[in-house]
Amino acid sequence: MCIRDSVARFARQERFRNRIVLIEDYDIAIGRLITSGSDVWLNNPRRPQEASGTSGQKVILNGGLNLSVLDGWWPEGFDGTNGWAIGDDRVRPDTPESDKADADALYSILETEVADEWTRRAKGLPKAWIKRMRRSIETCSPLFTSHRMVRDYALELYR
C-alpha cells in the first residue's frame, strides 16, 4: 500500500475527518505558499528524524512562529522566547507511551501558550504574539541563512 492510500484510508475515519491534508506533488511553489501563509509552523517528527528543517526557517522570514520538537535546527534556534518547543530533546523509543508524552506536551503548549498569545489582544493586537514574532526574526534570521547552509554542507558533508 502506498503512502497516499494509507493517508486516504486514515482520512476517511471519523476521528481524522477534516484533520489530515496530504499535499501531492509538493514543490517549491507550494512550499512558498504554505510557509508564507502560516502563523504557526508545526514540526513534530520523531527525534532524531528531522533532516534539517528549512521550512521552519523560511516561516520565520514571513513572520510565522515555530512549534517544533527539539530536533534538526530548532535546538540551536530556540531560546524560549522565539517560538515553542514540544517536549524535551530526549530521543524516546517508538512506543505508544512516547507518542502520548509528545501529544500531551503539544496539546499543553497549544492550549496554554499558543492559543492564549494569539487570542489575548490589547487594542486589537496580540502584543505577546508580535513580540515573539519579532524575537524569532531577530534571533533566527541572522543564524540560518543559505550561505551558512552551503558552508555547513561543504564543511561537514562533503569532506
Residue ranges of predicted features:
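Catalytic binding pocket for nucleotide-activated donors in carbohydrate/polymer assembly enzymes
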Residues: 5, 35-159
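Short, conserved catalytic or adaptor-binding loops enriched in Gly and charged residues
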Residues: 9-15, 76-78
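Secondary-structure boundary/capping positions in well-ordered alpha/beta enzyme cores
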Residues: 17-18, 41
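Active-site donor-binding acidic/aromatic loop of nucleotide-activated sugar
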Residues: 18-27
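Acidic, amphipathic alpha-helical patches
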Residues: 30-31
